[in-house]
Swiss-Prot record:
Na(+)/H(+) antiporter that extrudes sodium in exchange for external protons. The lineage of its organism: Bacteria, Pseudomonadati, Pseudomonadota, Acidithiobacillia, Acidithiobacillales. This is Na(+)/H(+) antiporter NhaA. GO terms for biological process: regulation of pH. Signal peptide: none annotated. Its main location: membrane. The gene is nhaA. GO terms for molecular function: sodium:proton antiporter activity.
Length: 436
């Protein structure tokens, strides 16, 4: 049976492949004879009505405000798991990836700011701060047999810490005017969710029933809906209703009951043997009760996010018409600032902050990981894609600036992935580099 981390790696790798395929399809559609219909499709409106109440959004907004809230909900579940029992659960283990993530966010923002110090373009400083976990881990796993396993764990923890930083940036710097009444209602709903957690509610339905209006009022408050996904995830209980030892005792008793029923019954089909079906259902309910709601939801939703939400997001946001790319667009301050911020900023920020943390004995390199491995991971940190595209949509209202940022993100992701892959392939050929 695969460990949770191995399951995560498998999903991330497959998800990266699907995301690449969706991006290629998007670029094909954007540069085909269907490009007008392609763009018009995402501007179609979808409305929800109930009496006099109406909630009307374009498909593009439903994806960015709705589906991406589900993505951030899963990110929140992953963050909570990492803080409780994962690589970020202890200061000693979390120090290096967290410091590396901070450096990897500050340096790209500073580089972008050097090219765009004033004007509307200056609002895009948050675009190169993000790392796409699916792409970066997917590339790294291609070399899993040549590199230390702890390098994959390091980059995963870094990307998760990076996601948290991106969420904070969105919440603090990309939130327009706040609507206090809606914010107060959202706060009351969040309080109700926290009370569910503290009072031992382990069924997921109450969290869903309160979580949906919470998401709606967060949107009305002016805060981006993705923040609602993170907060909702943090309220989901991380403990099951029964403990493992209690589960073992109950399973032992039910197992004996099941054996006795099988021995004394001629009908062994649960469809026609109600007693047998009842015992099996009790065993199933006990097993579910032992799993934390957080685990159940993450296991159930993450495949949908990996193979549906993110590819649909790419289809709606990654399209760029190459015929519209001019020399001015290619060398615009937004394109260059975004591209250099991701490629050089991530490499320098992650590399230098990690070196400084180890040098000052604040952190240590993971077992089996050498500096040349870590620098390879730093190059891969420049794959910004999903989160960078998302922040670009929030940062710019001007379609021209959005297109320039999109071009910079695509170029940077391609360059960073190529350099990182070649770098790690080359340095892993050195003797003594046996995966740990």
């Amino acid at each position: 049976m695969l460990s949770p981390f191995e399951q995560f790696l498998r999903r991330a790798t497959a998800g990266g492949i699907v995301l690449i395929a969706a991006t290629i399809l998007t670029l094909i559609l954007s540069n085909s004879t269907w490009h007008t219909a392609y763009h018009a499709f995402w501007e179609q409106h979808l409305s929800l009505r109930w009496g006099n109440w109406i909630f009307d959004q374009s498909l593009h907004h439903w994806i960015n405000d709705g589906l991406m809230a589900v993505f951030f909900f899963v990110v929140g579940l992953e963050l909570k798991r990492e803080f409780l029992v994962g690589e970020l659960s202890s200061l000693r283990d979390a120090a290096l990836p967290v410091i590396a993530a901070l450096g990897g966010m500050l340096a790209p923002a500073l580089i972008y700011h050097q090219f765009n110090p004033t004007g509307p373009a200056a609002d895009g400083w948050g675009i190169p701060m993000a790392t796409d976990i699916a792409f970066a881990i997917g590339i790294l796993v291609l070399l899993a047999w040549r590199i230390p396993r702890n390098l994959i764990i390091f980059l995963t923890a870094l990307a998760i810490a990076d996601d948290l930083g991106a969420v904070l940036v969105i919440a603090i710097f990309y939130t327009p005017a706040l609507h206090i009444k809606a914010l107060m209602i959202a706060a009351l709903l969040l309080l109700a969710l926290l009370l569910f957690n503290r009072s031992g509610v382990r069924h997921t339905l109450p969290y869903l029933l309160v979580g949906l209006p919470f998401w709606y009022f967060v949107i009305l408050s002016g805060i981006h809906a993705t923040v609602a996904g993170i907060f909702l995830a943090f309220t989901i209980p991380a403990r099951g209703r029964i403990l493992p030892d209690e589960l073992a005792d109950n399973l032992s008793a039910h197992g004996q009951h099941l054996r006795d029923t099988i021995t004394h019954s001629k009908r062994l089909n649960p469809l026609v043997n109600g007693q047998l079906a009842g015992i099996i259902q009790d065993i199933r309910n006990l097993s579910v009760a032992a799993l934390a709601p957080q685990q159940r939801l993450e296991h159930a939703i993450q495949p949908w996010v990996t193979f549906a939400v993110l590819p649909v997001f790419a289809l709606a946001n990654a399209g760029i018409n190459f015929a519209h790319i001019s020399v001015n667009m290619l060398f615009s301050s937004v394109t260059i600032g975004t591209c250099l911020g991701l490629v050089l900023g991530k490499f320098l920020g992650i590399g230098l902050s990690s070196w400084l943390a180890v040098r000052l004995k604040i952190a240590r390199l993971p077992a089996g990981v050498r500096w040349r491995h870590l620098l390879g991971a730093a190059w891969l940190g420049g794959i910004g894609f999903t989160m960078s595209l998302f922040i670009g949509q929030l940062a710019f209202g001007d379609p021209r600036l959005r297109e320039e940022a999109k071009l910079g993100i695509l170029l940077a992701s391609l360059i960073a992935a190529s350099i990182g892959l070649l770098w790690l392939f080359q340095v892993s050929r050195k003797k003594g580099d046996v995966p740990a």
